[in-house]
């Protein structure tokens, strides 16, 4: 059977107290609705329809995915009305309904769920709670068959005691939806068209209503305010941390790691507290990451040590490198094996060769540095003239003395030396020495100025 996924994302989210549409608030650095789109994509649906309303243009601009169609719900008249807006875009045999503010539903749960659906079966995802307050209840008959769902505001005292609740997620045939959605009524406490009323229709028409519960209750938790958003963020991060630890990664405090992207981390990696991993991050075996580091779209080679408070953004780091503390690697930086970038060093769009050292207080931009180069403290590559960027080349074995300025474009040759305090504006040949500083003048018996 072909599958269409309908994602309801039209709500304003008044309790978020935000100009941003609710479904665009992020969990792990990604909009909630994008989490749902990505989970749905694991099912390889023929079609995904997102029902939008409040802030629709923002939502459309923020979501990525293949074969996504958009249906507008101009008036917020309930979940049944929302699904009805999607139906003109649905031609597939089966329809799965998901919610843009329920971001942690797992692909494996969805796969098990849709596997229960056929022309004669409607699947309903439920959950049993100790405290079901606020949720619609699942009403069953004496043979344990699902009869209907009753919303809390419409429930009797007996129905309020039921602990099995509706999560809102359901799947059924397109034909059933096309036949049943026009029959929904808004004659209820909310004055809305409830999607949940379809369950009674299905039961009365002889459809088998099959229920399934997720392995983890938080998979179906929704977000209505920032407190709930923060709670799901912590749940997500804890789940990611536990997966890493089971895969052989040491986390010195699992509650103080944030993953905001797609990470691949090998075994025997050690990660200290308050580390943030964003975007696409690959970390090979034996890497040690100190506290308060941020890695964004970075590849880190085996055995590398990253000291505290280091930012690595869009960089490739080789094996057995040493970084930090307080280093900043900006996009386009590539370090060969055994390179060292020390404290208060910034690099950008530069290659640093094998075994080269840039240990202290230095800016390396638009540069190509060979093997075994030593760059002294306070060195600046002057790469920008206010309009254009130029390259600095330091060839193998070059030695740059402290407090030097290298005015690009400039090349320092193989095994060449630049004396400390120099401003270099011309190329230096292989094995040469360049010293470019004013002559020292000493004044004997100098009297300092006095105040007043």
Curated annotation (Swiss-Prot):
- State the organism named in the record: Alcanivorax borkumensis (strain ATCC 700651 / DSM 11573 / NCIMB 13689 / SK2)
Q: Which SUPFAM superfamilies match?
A: Nucleotide-diphospho-sugar transferases, Trimeric LpxA-like enzymes
This chain belongs to which protein, by name? Bifunctional protein GlmU
Where is it mostly found? cytoplasm
Locate the residues binding Mg(2+): 101, 224
Q: Specify the pathway.
A: Nucleotide-sugar biosynthesis; UDP-N-acetyl-alpha-D-glucosamine biosynthesis; N-acetyl-alpha-D-glucosamine 1-phosphate from alpha-D-glucosamine 6-phosphate (route II): step 2/2; Nucleotide-sugar biosynthesis; UDP-N-acetyl-alpha-D-glucosamine biosynthesis; UDP-N-acetyl-alpha-D-glucosamine from N-acetyl-alpha-D-glucosamine 1-phosphate: step 1/1; Bacterial outer membrane biogenesis; LPS lipid A biosynthesis
* Cellular component, GO annotation: cytoplasm; membrane
Q: Which reaction does it catalyse?
A: alpha-D-glucosamine 1-phosphate + acetyl-CoA = N-acetyl-alpha-D-glucosamine 1-phosphate + CoA + H(+); N-acetyl-alpha-D-glucosamine 1-phosphate + UTP + H(+) = UDP-N-acetyl-alpha-D-glucosamine + diphosphate
Q: Which NCBIfam families match?
A: glmU
Q: What is the role of the protein in this entry?
A: Catalyzes the last two sequential reactions in the de novo biosynthetic pathway for UDP-N-acetylglucosamine (UDP-GlcNAc). The C-terminal domain catalyzes the transfer of acetyl group from acetyl coenzyme A to glucosamine-1-phosphate (GlcN-1-P) to produce N-acetylglucosamine-1-phosphate (GlcNAc-1-P), which is converted into UDP-GlcNAc by the transfer of uridine 5-monophosphate (from uridine 5-triphosphate), a reaction catalyzed by the N-terminal domain.
């Amino acid at each position: 059977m072909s599958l269409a996924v309908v994602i309801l994302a039209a709500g304003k989210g008044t309790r978020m107290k935000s100009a941003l549409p609710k479904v665009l608030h992020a969990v792990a650095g990604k909009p909630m609705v994008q989490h749902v789109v990505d989970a749905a994509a694991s099912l390889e649906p023929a079609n995904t329809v997102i029902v939008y309303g409040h802030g629709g243009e923002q939502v459309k601009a923020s979501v990525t995915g293949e074969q996504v169609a958009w249906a507008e719900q101009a008036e917020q008249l309930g979940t049944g009305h929302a699904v009805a807006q999607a139906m003109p875009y649905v031609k597939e045999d089966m329809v799965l309904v998901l919610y843009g503010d329920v971001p942690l539903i797992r692909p494996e749960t969805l796969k098990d769920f849709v596997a229960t659906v056929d022309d004669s079966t409607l699947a309903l995802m439920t959950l049993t709670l100790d405290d079901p307050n606020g949720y619609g209840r699942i009403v069953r008959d004496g043979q344990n068959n699902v009869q209907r769902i009753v919303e809390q505001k419409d429930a009797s005292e007996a129905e309020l005691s039921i602990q099995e609740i509706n999560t809102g997620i359901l799947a059924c045939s397109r034909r059933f939806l096309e036949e049943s959605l026009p029959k929904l009524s808004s004659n209820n406490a909310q004055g809305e068209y409830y999607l949940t009323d379809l369950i009674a229709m299905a039961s009365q028409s002889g459809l088998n209503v099959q229920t399934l519960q997720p392995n983890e209750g938080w998979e179906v938790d929704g977000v209505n305010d920032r407190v709930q958003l923060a709670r799901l963020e912590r749940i997500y991060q804890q789940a990611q941390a536990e997966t890493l630890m089971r895969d052989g990664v040491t986390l010195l405090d699992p509650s103080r790691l944030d993953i905001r992207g797609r990470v691949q981390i090998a075994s025997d990696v050690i990660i200290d507290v308050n580390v943030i991993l964003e975007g696409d991050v690959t970390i090979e075996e034996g890497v040690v990451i100190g506290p308060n580091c941020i890695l964004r779209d970075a590849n880190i080679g085996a055995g590398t040590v990253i000291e505290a408070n280091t930012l690595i953004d869009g960089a490739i780091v080789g094996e057995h490198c040493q970084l930090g503390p307080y280093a900043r690697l900006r996009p386009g930086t590539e370090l060969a094996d055994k390179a060292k970038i020390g404290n208060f060093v910034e690099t950008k769009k530069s290659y640093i060769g094998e075994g080269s050292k840039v240990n202290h207080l230095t800016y390396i931009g638009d540069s190509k540095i060979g093997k075994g180069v030593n760059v002294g403290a306070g060195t600046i590559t002057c790469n920008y003239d206010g309009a254009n960027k130029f390259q600095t080349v330091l060839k193998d074995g070059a030695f740059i003395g402290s407090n030097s300025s290298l005015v690009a474009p400039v090349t320092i040759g193989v095994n060449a030396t630049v004396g400390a305090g120099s401003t270099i504006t011309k190329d230096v040949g292989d094995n040469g020495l360049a010293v470019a500083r004013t002559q020292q003048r000493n004044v004997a018996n100098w009297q300092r100025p006095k105040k007043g």
